[in-house]
A protein has these predicted regions:
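Soluble catalytic domains of membrane acyltransferases
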Residues: 8, 17-140
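Helix-enriched interaction subdomains in cytosolic or periplasmic regions
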Residues: 1-11
Length: 140
């Protein structure tokens, strides 16, 4: 978790120097600064999670769902994801444990970032959402 708070300002600086960042609807995020919420955007690019976490408010950790294949790319990336608190979604009974953990985190006021389609859609079209988002929202 310490890595999360060290890398967040660094990433913010790099992305604001290298990219023109424009966040739409940021005022809606400010409304829930002190409450738990679920952010469920369309997933177009591999860099989406980074931009979303950076555009969030400082000092608030965001739980990010990541599909298991991302944890299998290499050891360094797996270590990085774990240090940042990413939740590995495997699609098995472990998913129920993740859902329970996520519901508790939302109730405790944390923010969850989940891409409901479970994958990227590079053309920007919406894919059918997976059921996990709805289960979490209903229980939280």
């Amino acid at each position: 978790m310490v890595l999360y708070y060290i890398l967040l300002p660094l990433a913010w600086l790099v992305f604001h120097i290298g990219f023109r960042v424009h966040t739409v609807g940021r005022e809606n995020l400010r409304k829930v600064q002190t409450k738990g919420c679920i952010i469920a955007p369309n997933h177009v690019s591999a860099i989406d999670p980074v931009f979303i976490v950076i555009s969030r408010f400082w000092g608030r950790r965001m739980l990010v769902f990541a599909k298991k294949e991302l944890f299998e790319i290499n050891v360094l990336l797996t270590w990085f994801f774990r240090c940042c608190g990413a939740l590995c979604v495997r699609g098995t009974k472990e998913e129920l444990e993740i859902i329970d953990r996520t519901v508790e985190a939302c109730r405790a006021g944390e923010t969850l970032l989940i891409f409901p389609e479970g994958t990227r859609e590079k053309e920007g079209r919406f894919l059918p959402p997976k059921s996990g988002l709805f289960v979490i929202a209903a229980q939280a």
